[in-house]
UniProtKB/Swiss-Prot annotation:
It catalyses: tRNA(Phe) + L-phenylalanine + ATP = L-phenylalanyl-tRNA(Phe) + AMP + diphosphate + H(+). PANTHER family: PHENYLALANINE--TRNA LIGASE, MITOCHONDRIAL (PTHR11538:SF41), PHENYLALANYL-TRNA SYNTHETASE (PTHR11538). One of its GO terms (molecular function) is ATP binding. Belongs to the class-II aminoacyl-tRNA synthetase family. Phe-tRNA synthetase alpha subunit type 1 subfamily. Mg(2+) binds at E252. The gene is pheS. Disulfide bonds: none annotated. This is Phenylalanine--tRNA ligase alpha subunit. It is found in: Cytoplasm. Keywords: Aminoacyl-tRNA synthetase, ATP-binding, Cytoplasm, Ligase, Magnesium, Metal-binding, Nucleotide-binding, Protein biosynthesis. Its cofactor is Mg(2+). One of its GO terms (cellular component) is cytoplasm.
């Protein structure tokens, strides 16, 4: 038994001196593994005289239990030390200056569009959406565009090889809406539209919002009242407005809306902001609505145009150049 005691004392000292989990595992295998020294002592019990086996077995079991407990304790100590070291390395010094996150903001065109939609929602209009890739029927034919109309030309419209096109206005959404709903109708459609045009006040892609009302007793006076209320609500002040006769294939009569806009030098000039009119009877017939019973009005505006006026931007292209210095002004 003195041999077992001596082996145990040396083994406990080695366990206490182990500095890594790998060293500790190697000691466990050397002591308690299938070929370990303690296991070898158990295998030799059968060679001892019968009167010594019990005492020797008890001593070996006590040694094994002591070593197992020591190994577990040392393993826990090493793991705790490793965790403490890792946490110390990852510790955040709360006294150091923080890194401020960049504050995001909505694009001025998005802010303008949301404001317009909110105003018309208060007036009872439902927002509807439609595809940006349209067919000739929804973009032109159903809206009373004659075959020879210049808007159908390649130099004004982006066509695909199969005859489809990038919508030139959101009016196609109105056609789809009238196909799917019965009067009375109060709807607006907003989104990207595409035209082959690019200069200081035009872009090949821009945002448009159009509105439509169809009911049994709608009049041009209702249209004027609606647009007057919208302009007042958007700019938060009253404007002198005028409605000039104009031609659009899908309305009759048609008009363009001007507001008396004050210049930086204090002078006032008429500024076009909207197109509108009473829905043409042919458009109503094309969607199965009886023009003898129902009338309606429609209107449309360029969202970028209203954004330019609201924020004092002179060049439309600034909205699409993604210059953070410019956009941050509106965040």
């Amino acid at each position: 038994m003195s041999e077992i005691q001596s082996l145990t004392e040396r083994a406990l000292a080695d366990v206490a001196a182990a500095q890594t989990p790998d060293q500790l595992e190697a000691l466990r295998v050397a002591l308690l593994g299938k070929s370990g020294s303690i296991t070898a002592q158990l295998k030799q019990l059968g060679t001892l005289p019968a009167d010594q086996r019990k005492a020797a077995g008890e001593a070996i079991n006590l040694s094994r239990d002591a070593l197992t407990a020591a190994l577990a304790e040392r393993k826990n100590t090493l793991e705790t030390a490793a965790l403490d070291a890792r946490l110390a390395g990852e510790r955040i010094d709360v006294t150091l200056p923080g890194r401020r996150s960049e504050r995001g903001g909505l694009h001025p065109v998005t802010r303008t569009l949301e404001r317009i939609v909110e105003i018309f929602a208060r007036l009872g209009y439902e927002l509807s959406d439609g595809p940006e890739i349209e067919d000739d029927w929804h973009n032109f034919e159903a809206l009373n565009f004659p075959p020879h109309h210049p808007a159908r030309a390649m130099h004004d419209t982006f066509y695909f090889g199969d005859g489809r096109l990038l919508r030139t206005h959101t009016s196609g959404v109105q056609v789809r809406y009238m196909d799917a709903h019965k009067p009375p109708l109060h709807m607006i459609a907003a989104g990207k539209v595409y035209r082959s045009d690019s200069d200081q006040t035009h872009s090949p892609m821009f945002h448009q919002l159009e509105g439509l009302l169809v009911d049994e007793h709608s009049t041009f006076a209702d249209l004027k009242g609606t647009l007057s209320e919208f302009v007042r609500a958007f700019f938060e002040r009253d404007f002198e407005m005028r409605f000039r006769p104009s031609y659009f294939p899908f309305v009759e009569p048609g008009a363009e809306v001007d507001i008396a806009w004050q210049q930086p030098d204090g002078s006032t000039r008429w500024l076009e902001v909207l197109g509108c009119g009473m829905v043409h009877p042919n458009v109503l017939r094309n969607v199965g609505i009886d023009p003898e019973r129902y009338t309606g009005f429609a209107f449309g505006l360029g969202v970028e145009r209203f954004a330019m006026l609201r924020y004092g931007v002179n060049d439309l292209r600034a909205f699409f150049e993604n210059d953070v210095r410019f956009l941050r002004q509106f965040a």
